[in-house]
Structure formats: structure tokens, C-alpha cells
Amino acid sequence: MRKTQPKKIPLAPDPKFNDKLVTRFVNNLMWAGKKSGAYIIFYDALDKVAKITGENGYEVWKKALGNITPGVEVRSRRIGGATFQIPAEVRTDRKISLSIKWMVKYSRDRNGRSMSDKLANEIVAASKGEGAAFKKKEDTHRMAEANKAFAHFRI
């Protein structure tokens, strides 16, 4: 294990909403260092979300992220020659990272014309408690529930 914690790189808030969470999302959305392109995709997606739902796209996106944020996950631990899946609470920072990664991943896997279309559809689905990213969260929680018997083991 490493001796010291790595330094956290300070994030600049995004230009439109002045939110660091948006910057984190855009950094995960970005391909090949093209950050301005990622911002364009993200803002287009929020505009499309606003058009679809009739609500503020930014608020719908925040709600969607909240809906796919996991509370518990399973971690592998080897005990006496057997590997157990032990349920553990997810750290706050990791919760956010996982929800962002899942939303971006399952948006890319969707069918659609452009990435902004796919992202908009995934945001709308997640805000309603549907979609692949929400299903991933549910599966993670279900896995933790199924392995509740091993919760007394330390990780």
C-alpha cells in the first residue's frame, strides 16, 4: 500500500454553471484531451434534456446523478483459501466517481445519432429511475444484499 495520499488536483468550476461537479463529469466524458468538445456535448445534452422534460436540464442531471449513486458495494476478500464478496459502504468521493463513470459508460453504449443525444436520453432515463446506469446501481445494491451474511468480515 502507498504511504501517503496522492495530492488532489484542484478543479476549476465550469464556465456556465460554475460547478466543479460538472467539470468532473466533463473530464470523464472527454476523449483524447478534447475538453472543449466534451463541454459542447454536455451542454447540448442538457439543452435536449430541458426540451424533453420541460424542466431545467441542469437540475434533471443532478437528480439523475443522485438516482444512480450507489450506497453500498461488494469488495473481494480472500479468507482461508476462499474469496468472499463482502458488502461495504462506499466512500463519498467514490460514490460520485462511480455514478459519473456509469452514466458516461452507459450513455456511450446506447443507440443514438450523437453522443449528446445518447447522454440526454440516459440522463432522462436515470432521473426517472430507469436506464442502464440505474440498473447497474440496483445490481450493485442487490449483490451487497445477497452477501449480507459476510458483512461481519473486515475489509
Q: Residue locations for each model-derived region?
A:
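Strongly charged
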Residues: 1-32, 36-39, 43-155
